[in-house]
UniProtKB/Swiss-Prot annotation:
It catalyses: a tRNA precursor + 2 CTP + ATP = a tRNA with a 3' CCA end + 3 diphosphate; a tRNA with a 3' CCA end + 2 CTP + ATP = a tRNA with a 3' CCACCA end + 3 diphosphate. A single active site specifically recognizes both ATP and CTP and is responsible for their addition. Keywords: ATP-binding, Magnesium, Metal-binding, Nucleotide-binding, Nucleotidyltransferase, RNA repair, RNA-binding, Transferase, tRNA processing. This is CCA-adding enzyme. CTP binds at residues 8, 11, 91, 137, 140. GO terms for biological process: RNA repair; tRNA 3'-terminal CCA addition.
Length: 368
């Protein structure tokens, strides 16, 4: 039995980057031997075990064969006679197909170290084209390592185009696609992910509503620079689409509720946000009501951040509308409902009276 660190842990150590998760590969062992040593089985499709003390994942060396469409269309074979090289060749990129033994010796049968030095994302074997999820994974790695100067190798991009043209991307579930998009959105340069998808034809397959123009991606780029959370980045990406298109994208990818809500509200209200300084008090109140700023102030704040990121992406140096709207929201929230309740108002009458008082507060705010 031989145990190796594999994949990202080896890659990131060689790049001098922090190593978070470690994947372990076991060569020359049987399921029975792993169980006898106290490892706990967790793999549904192939033998993966949890270490009895650390809880880290240890997988038996395996080969795989294409047996159907999509990400899950593979048959796996794990046995003690599967070699290290046979296991590594099934991996996506050469930089992910390196292993390191307990003595620190790196095994690199497919020139991953050479590609690290060349800053190349290159596939290991032609079998790369059998897994459509790899198109998204490579684009995500391109986004992650763009600051280090990495690019997708021409021959790998050609295979990605082949996958996109084959229709195999349609076999990906919404959950798998969203998981990769979500991870890509949180990379340092998420706009690179969408540029790579566009370059290989995958963007048109997965997100035909989008393009890779600088304006489309500029707000997202700004959101990443300012380290904004996922739902803000998602809304920034979709900010140029119509509400109808935003709804279609959200439903197709089954985006999380928080992402869906902010993206939809942005699509519906971005124009009003940009015109805030000219809005009459009635329109201002309607905007605040739409966001329910009285009970959900953070959602409105997130919207203002999206507006600001979009303005920065469009080349604006500042966005005074944001502070103007924050002060307007504070003025509306400051209205005290108690006197109205004490006056005996209830139900719809109370709601209308409260709305009227908030309108007066906004008019007073606008008068200065």
């Amino acid at each position: 039995m031989h145990i190796y660190k594999v994949g990202g842990a080896v890659r990131d150590r060689l790049l001098g980057r922090p190593v978070s998760d470690i994947d372990w590969l076991v060569v020359g062992a049987t399921v029975e031997e792993m169980l006898a040593k106290g490892y706990r089985p967790v793999g549904a499709d192939f033998p993966v075990f949890l270490h009895p003390k650390t809880g880290e994942e240890y997988a038996l060396a395996r080969t795989e064969r294409k047996s159907g469409r999509g990400y899950g269309g593979f048959t796996f074979h794990a046995s003690p006679d599967v070699t290290l090289e046979e296991d590594l060749i099934r991996r996506d990129l050469t930089i992910n197909a390196m292993a390191e033994d307990e003595a620190g010796t790196v095994y690199d049968p497919y020139q991953g170290k050479q590609d690290l030095d060349k800053r190349l994302l290159r596939h290991v074997s032609p079998a790369f084209a059998e897994d459509p999820l790899r198109v998204l994974r490579v684009a995500r790695f391109a986004a992650r390592y763009a600051p280090l100067g990495f690019r997708v190798a021409d021959e790998t991009l050609a295979l990605m185009r082949q996958i996109s043209a084959s229709g195999e991307l349609q076999a990906l579930t919404a959950e798998r696609s969203w998981k990769e998009i979500e991870r890509a959105l949180m990379e340092v340069q998420p706009q690179v992910f969408f540029k790579v998808l566009s370059a290989c034809g995958a963007l048109q397959e997965l997100l035909p509503e989008l393009d890779d123009s600088s304006r489309t991606l500029a707000a997202l780029e700004q959101a990443a620079v300012h380290e904004q959370p996922l739902h803000v980045r998602w809304a920034c990406l979709l900010r140029g689409l119509s509400p109808t298109s935003i709804k279609a994208v959200n439903q197709r990818l089954k985006a999380p509720r928080e992402c869906q809500e902010l993206a939809m509200l942005t699509g519906e209200c971005l124009a009003q946000g940009n015109q805030a300084l000219e809005l009459p008090a009635t329109a201002l109140l309607e905007l605040l009501q739409k966001f329910d700023v009285y009970r959900r102030p953070q959602r409105f704040e997130d919207f203002l951040v999206v507006c600001e990121m979009a303005a920065r992406g469009d080349g604006e140096q500042g966005y005074p509308q944001a502070d103007y709207l924050r002060r307007a929201a504070a003025a509306a929230r400051a209205v005290d409902v108690k006197p109205l309740v004490q006056a005996g108002l209830t139900g719809q009458a109370l709601g209308e009276a409260l709305k009227g008082e908030r309108l007066k507060a906004l008019e007073a705010y606008q008068r200065g």
